[in-house]
């Protein structure tokens, strides 16, 4: 049996290979499996990294779907939005779990080309705005109860 970390690596590589072959549907399956990996012995940081990597795969899948000439235009548009919205949702989930408390992770995300397909989306812009606002706010002091 493989460890959850090994499974995560394999799912990420499989998703990337599927994208290289323009198979966005299979890449999305890998991304969803990656996002859903859970293990009681894994650190939450690893699980958050899985969700971040899944968001990257979904973002890239949205770009691949946009170029899929075999799909009708309406279906193509719907898939692009579905994949991209799911990618943003995973990033928001990661933020709520504390993944972006590390400024290095925020800096990486801001320049990560895997997320370029999301950058013009309103929900992604809102996510960035909220992330930057929370980064400038000091942690709330503990209450004296």
Please place each PLM-identified region on the residue numbering.
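Alpha-helical protein-protein interaction modules
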Residues: 1-145
